[in-house]
């Protein structure tokens, strides 16, 4: 959500625009000692993508590329995070369910309705959303018997039907490869749907 407000012109006549952003990746942590790595997700290394592509070609593997739909919303938020919902969106929520939302609405000095909510799921744009999804995806893959590569935490392998299946990922985009197309198709339909990773 982005709220844009035009400010008055300065002494030289230049207009200034101010924006406040929620869940857009802007500074959500500004306290001393916070490191960017505390909230960032690992992603597949470029050389891993190239090397797995070389192996795929050499072994004549079948490949599937999938995008995990609603990936972040599948991940539980592990911190207490509040989000302010201003103005029109707040009004729409009250219209949707007055009994639920109206008691929690408050107004700014300028009369703008506001609603604070607790975020239970990882929300697109939240600083830690990609990291939370990474942890979930990695745990799900390990539960399926995949071993994560010790040199790249976004590459995982498992021997299926006597041949290696490789999954390489960048956030919610996965490349799955195996010599048997049925294994790749099984990975993208049955197993992924079972884990609710795709809908």
Locate each region found by the language model.
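Long, low-complexity, charge-biased intrinsically disordered regions
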Residues: 1-199
């Amino acid at each position: 959500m982005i709220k844009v407000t035009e400010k008055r012109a300065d002494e030289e006549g230049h207009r200034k625009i101010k924006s406040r952003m929620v869940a857009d990746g802007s500074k959500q942590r500004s306290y001393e000692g916070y490191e960017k790595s505390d909230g960032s997700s690992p992603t597949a290394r470029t050389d891993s993508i190239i090397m797995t592509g070389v192996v795929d070609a050499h072994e004549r593997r079948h490949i599937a590329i999938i995008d995990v739909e609603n990936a972040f919303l599948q991940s539980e938020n592990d911190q207490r995070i509040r989000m302010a919902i201003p103005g029109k969106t707040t009004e729409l929520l009250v219209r949707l369910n007055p009994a639920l939302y109206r008691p929690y609405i408050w107004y700014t000095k300028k009369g703008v309705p506001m609603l604070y909510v607790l975020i239970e799921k990882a929300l697109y744009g939240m600083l830690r959303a990609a990291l939370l999804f990474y942890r979930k995806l990695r745990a799900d893959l390990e539960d399926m018997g995949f071993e994560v590569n010790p040199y790249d935490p976004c590459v995982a392998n498992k021997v299926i039907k006597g041949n290696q299946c490789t999954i390489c990922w960048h956030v919610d985009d996965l490349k799955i490869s195996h010599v048997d197309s049925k294994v790749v198709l099984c990975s993208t339909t049955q197993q992924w749907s079972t884990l609710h990773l795709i809908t």
